[in-house]
Structure formats: structure tokens, C-alpha cells
Design a protein with these regions (language model features):
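Conserved AdoMet/S-adenosylmethionine-binding subsite of the radical SAM
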Residues: 80, 91-232
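Conserved Radical SAM active-site core
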Residues: 8, 24-25, 31, 36-127
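Short, low-complexity, intrinsically disordered N-terminal peptides in bacterial proteins
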Residues: 1-5, 69-70, 203
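A generic secondary-structure signal marking the coil-to-beta-strand transition
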Residues: 3, 24-26, 36, 184, ...
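Short secondary-structure boundary/capping segments within folded domains
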Residues: 16-20, 32, 223
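Short, charged low-complexity linear segments at domain edges
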Residues: 1-24
């Protein structure tokens, strides 16, 4: 395996989102993103990182995942060990593709978190693709690549980050229009929209005129509308 990636960090933690939430996971955070979502909490990964050879990354993942490869937890959950590529936007670096393939070949359950702004069709089909559909408050709704929806399957997941009433209504309309619940699990993640004075100047501003929604209000709406989503 030849080539390299610019990596922000590699670490072991518990998966906090998706249908894999709560499981141990090795995270590979890659550097660079071409979106500037208003609520981004990893802006440090836009530029900070170090070039690392794929073989070095692979070895580090194996080292961190080793305790879970033969543990009792592994016997209870065959999905372990988990590895997730995140960012930043992993698909901006083409060598993320052979790395994911190699990790799958080595028996890892591989996840990728991607913005939905780049073609996902070239990703190894064994990889679980957790793809965003950017809502209005992100400031990046125009970057959604609609053609990606046709490439999703039952092992993938779609994530909506909801911070306003308009986000909720937009997400609900997308679910209905594309019958998304018949494709894969759907995730709703709540976010508190930042006031202008709280926002980093490198991020898109929250579009004017949107109505913030609280976590409680979002949960109540999901229940009232019987939406087929997982609230996280």
C-alpha cells in the first residue's frame, strides 16, 4: 500500500453518533474541508495536519484497535473493531479510498462521515457511509450532491443536522420526496445555532430569518409527525 494522507489526528474513543453509537472506535480525522458549515466544531481540521504514509496510518489503527480484536466485547459484537474516517472531508483526499479498502480487507468495520458534497460511488461497498444532507441553517444547502442518493443502500446512513424550524421542515420534505426511509437509517442531530458574535469568521453565517428550535421542540416534532428517524 503506497501513498499518503494529511492527517489531523488518530485516536481511540467511543462512537458518539450513528447506529454504531456507544461502541469503541478508532477515528482517523483527515485535514481539509471545502465546506464552511455555520455550526462546524472541527474548524481546526481545515488546515492543521501532518502528512503520514498509508502504511503508518494502517499500523496505528491496528495498534489502537488491538485490545478489541480478541476481547469478550468482540464476541458479543462482531462489528468490532470499528474504524471511522472523518474530517474535515475525507473524500477530498483520494488516498482515503485505498485506505478504506485495505482496512475492510483486514477485517475492520469501516465507517466514513462525509458532507454529501462529493461523489460517494467510488467508496468500497463494504464501507458504511454516513452522509450528511445539509440543511438551510448550515449555509451550505446548495452543496448537497443530489446524485449521491441513488448510490446509498441499507448499510449506509443519512444525517440531518437540525438547528432551526426551517431545517426540520426541509429535512421532512426531503425524506418524503426521496422516500429516504426506504433506503437506509436516518439520523437527526440537534445543534444550537450560533449568534453572529459567537461564530468563527471562517464559517458561513446562519442565514437570516430562520427560527431556532430547541432540543425538546425537535423531539416533540419528531414524535408528533411520527418521523422514521433516530434522534441523537
Amino acid at each position: 500500500m503506497t501513498g499518503s494522507l494529511v492527517v489531523n489526528e488518530i485516536y481511540l474513543s467511543l462512537q458518539g453518533e450513528s447506529t454504531f453509537a456507544g461502541l469503541p472506535c478508532v477515528f482517523i480525522r483527515l485535514t481539509a474541508c471545502d465546506l464552511r458549515c455555520s455550526y462546524c466544531d472541527t474548524a481546526y481540521a481545515f488546515t492543521e495536519g501532518k502528512k503520514r504514509e498509508l502504511t503508518e496510518i494502517f499500523a496505528k489503527v491496528r495498534e489502537l484497535a488491538a485490545p478489541f480484536s480478541n476481547s469478550k466485547l468482540k464476541a458479543q459484537n462482531s462489528k468490532l473493531p470499528l474504524v471511522e474516517l472523518t474530517g474535515g472531508e475525507p473524500l477530498l483526499q483520494k488516498n482515503s479510498l485505498p485506505l478504506m479498502q485495505a482496512l475492510c480487507n483486514d477485517g475492520f468495520t469501516v465507517l466514513i462521515e462525509t458532507s454529501g458534497a462529493h461523489d460517494i460511488s467510488q467508496i468500497d461497498p463494504r464501507v458504511h457511509r454516513i452522509m450528511d444532507l445539509k440543511c438551510p441553517s448550515s449555509g451550505e444547502v446548495a452543496r448537497n450532491l443530489a446524485s449521491n442518493i441513488a448510490h446509498l443502500n441499507a448499510t449506509d446512513e443519512i444525517k440531518f443536522v437540525i438547528g432551526t424550524l426551517e431545517d426540520y421542515e426541509w429535512a421532512k420534505a426531503q425524506i418524503a420526496a426521496h422516500k429516504l426511509d426506504s433506503i437506509c437509517p436516518l439520523l437527526f442531530s440537534w445543534v444550537h445555532p450560533l449568534a453572529p458574535e459567537q461564530q468563527s469568521k471562517v464559517l458561513k453565517p446562519v442565514p437570516a430569518g430562520l427560527t431556532p428550535i430547541s432540543r425538546k421542540e425537535l423531539a416533540e416534532k419528531i414524535i408528533a409527525d411520527a418521523l422514521p428517524v433516530r434522534f441523537q
